[in-house]
């Protein structure tokens, strides 16, 4: 089945707990709220299990931007100690989102969505893409402006990659714009150039990508962004049991 039962997932958590794990767990799902009914059945079970053991785990997952429209879901996730969520924002350019058929990202202002999730005590991680068809010059700067405005600490960037057996691949193949075959298409978008002929010069896209990445992680700008972001985060409603720091934690502070 597409989703695990609450009983199965809680049993898996118990196995990790019995093995001595006490850190973060990433629930790997392209969209944790894709089946809202099942997610809302699961979350209270996780919360109860966590409460009984002093909240030994923190959770991270992936979700669509419309998580921001569901206050109940955000509250339930926070109460189960979901500390972070990865959003595929892709780009602040609405025309590019429409080209990519990511219509759920165009229904409401993206910066407001990030702020609502943040206010519920869930840290937003986000992915951004450069190189969409019809993209106007300056896309990299617009991503930097958006990340700076919202304060998102962890912003991943990549250049668009066409993957086999997708609508994008089929369209580009029909248009004769692919520059590599299926065997070479690995989907790595942070260290590779686009694997198709874009609608604007590839040199411009590559330069914007590098400049944007450097701007996002310039040390002073990054620290300012992280500081401003955590000032906006809602305080946790759960209370984890006190625990002694590990030697790894102590070495990190020295």
Regions found by a protein language model. Give the residues of each.
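Short clusters of hydrophobic/aromatic residues that line enzyme substrate/ligand-binding pockets
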Residues: 97-100, 168, 196
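Glycine-rich phosphate-binding active-site loops on the catalytic face of alpha/beta enzymes
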Residues: 155-161
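Flexible glycine/proline-rich, aromatic-decorated loop/lid segments
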Residues: 82, 111-114, 144-145, 163, ...
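Phosphate/oxyanion-binding loops and surfaces in catalytic or ligand/nucleic-acid-binding neighborhoods
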Residues: 16, 34, 49, 150, ...
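Structured loop/turn residues at secondary-structure junctions
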Residues: 30, 65, 160, 200-201
